[in-house]
Amino acid sequence: MKISLGLIYGGKSAEHNVSLQTALAVTKALNTEKFDIHPIYITEEGEWLRGEKLTEPVSNVRMLQFEQNAKTFLPTSLNESMFPQPTSADEKIDVVFPLLHGPNGEDGTMQGLLELLNIPYVGNGVLASAAGMDKVMMKDVFAQAGLAQAKHLSFNKKDYEKATPDSLEQVEQVLGYPCFVKPANMGSSVGISKCRSKEELQTAFDLAFQYDRRVVVEEGVVGREIEIGVLGNDEPKCSVVGEIAPKTDFYDYKAKYEDGDTDLIIPASVSEDEYKTIHDMAIKAFKSLDGSGLVRADFFLTEKGEVLINEVNTMPGFTPFSMFPLLWKHTGVEYPELIEKLVSLAIERHQEKQTIKTTF
């Protein structure tokens, strides 16, 4: 019997276009003999639409003809039923795969909605998604878990605006140059800047605060950028490691999604000891967040052989040139099998939750 799989994509986020690419790639990879696909598109304004197909080129995705007045996954009013009853068995959704990146999708908000609706969904739960999306909170969790990481500082917008000169001086004294300024709640390198001077630093703060009210500043680390995939629930497994080798100054949005001006080296050349350290730190990071389903863990490997965790991505991209699927492909897990495994993990975790008592 086929599994009815709802693909939620788009979203009210600066990473909207990345989500479109991910959704198209996943749709092409799905085995239609095993899955009935139900695309659910969230516009940039936050409107939910359901359509029959997601087969258009990415540039035309917004032009898809959605059914007028079709039942949406989320009603426009809370006075309506939170999840309208399907008119036929074909409309029932068994599992949701939220292919959303960034705020309003990857940050625990969508996961919370799906929890309330009691629908199995692929990926991390509310806690891991929220903490994994917020770089400030994530770094606090990693510090508590004893994971080595680069020096960093965090600022909120109002405090920064009240004492801009002091904030800039603090960055210079504690971190120095070069440093990286990032919105706390954003991915795909959106809003990130590399700074080599006070002028660049102030401009970078202004840019980052356009995307979030909190900003994290990290010291520049001289080293290789190494990534590893984690897959599973309570007994997670790791993929081979890959290396990001950008031809530009750093691995920004353009290098990731537009011109492809970056080499992905898979598997990366690391020693057995280095791999074990990366593997163990990735598993520890996953468990410290109470992860489920998947994460991609990103590290720095310094010239001295020190491994520093940079961040985890709780819903890594599935574009044709995204690192996470490629890591698992080189580990022996092809696209269709990877997606099937994620759906299976979603059902497994959902069934486990159903055994928890909710009355006293």
Curated annotation (Swiss-Prot):
<dbReference type="InterPro" id="IPR005905">
    <property type="entry name" value="D_ala_D_ala"/>
</dbReference>
<feature type="binding site">
    <location>
        <position position="313"/>
    </location>
    <ligand>
        <name>Mg(2+) 2</name>
    </ligand>
</feature>
<dbReference type="GO" id="GO:0009252">
    <property type="term" value="P:peptidoglycan biosynthetic process"/>
</dbReference>
<keyword id="KW-0436">Ligase</keyword>
<dbReference type="GO" id="GO:0046872">
    <property type="term" value="F:metal ion binding"/>
</dbReference>
<comment type="similarity">
    <text>Belongs to the D-alanine--D-alanine ligase family.</text>
</comment>
<keyword id="KW-0067">ATP-binding</keyword>
<feature type="binding site">
    <location>
        <begin position="172"/>
        <end position="227"/>
    </location>
    <ligand>
        <name>ATP</name>
    </ligand>
</feature>
<protein>
    <recommendedName>
        <fullName>D-alanine--D-alanine ligase</fullName>
        <ecNumber>6.3.2.4</ecNumber>
    </recommendedName>
</protein>
<dbReference type="InterPro" id="IPR011095">
    <property type="entry name" value="Dala_Dala_lig_C"/>
</dbReference>
<dbReference type="GO" id="GO:0005524">
    <property type="term" value="F:ATP binding"/>
</dbReference>
<dbReference type="InterPro" id="IPR011761">
    <property type="entry name" value="ATP-grasp"/>
</dbReference>
<dbReference type="Pfam" id="PF07478">
    <property type="entry name" value="Dala_Dala_lig_C"/>
</dbReference>
<dbReference type="InterPro" id="IPR011127">
    <property type="entry name" value="Dala_Dala_lig_N"/>
</dbReference>
<keyword id="KW-0479">Metal-binding</keyword>
<keyword id="KW-0963">Cytoplasm</keyword>
<feature type="binding site">
    <location>
        <position position="311"/>
    </location>
    <ligand>
        <name>Mg(2+) 1</name>
    </ligand>
</feature>
<dbReference type="InterPro" id="IPR000291">
    <property type="entry name" value="D-Ala_lig_Van_CS"/>
</dbReference>
<dbReference type="InterPro" id="IPR013815">
    <property type="entry name" value="ATP_grasp_subdomain_1"/>
</dbReference>
<keyword id="KW-0573">Peptidoglycan synthesis</keyword>
<comment type="function">
    <text>Cell wall formation.</text>
</comment>
<dbReference type="GO" id="GO:0005829">
    <property type="term" value="C:cytosol"/>
</dbReference>
<keyword id="KW-0464">Manganese</keyword>
<comment type="pathway">
    <text>Cell wall biogenesis; peptidoglycan biosynthesis.</text>
</comment>
<dbReference type="GO" id="GO:0008716">
    <property type="term" value="F:D-alanine-D-alanine ligase activity"/>
</dbReference>
<dbReference type="InterPro" id="IPR016185">
    <property type="entry name" value="PreATP-grasp_dom_sf"/>
</dbReference>
<keyword id="KW-0961">Cell wall biogenesis/degradation</keyword>
<feature type="binding site">
    <location>
        <position position="311"/>
    </location>
    <ligand>
        <name>Mg(2+) 2</name>
    </ligand>
</feature>
<feature type="binding site">
    <location>
        <position position="298"/>
    </location>
    <ligand>
        <name>Mg(2+) 1</name>
    </ligand>
</feature>
<keyword id="KW-0547">Nucleotide-binding</keyword>
<dbReference type="GO" id="GO:0071555">
    <property type="term" value="P:cell wall organization"/>
</dbReference>
<dbReference type="Pfam" id="PF01820">
    <property type="entry name" value="Dala_Dala_lig_N"/>
</dbReference>
<dbReference type="GO" id="GO:0008360">
    <property type="term" value="P:regulation of cell shape"/>
</dbReference>
<keyword id="KW-0460">Magnesium</keyword>
<feature type="domain" description="ATP-grasp">
    <location>
        <begin position="139"/>
        <end position="344"/>
    </location>
</feature>
<keyword id="KW-0133">Cell shape</keyword>
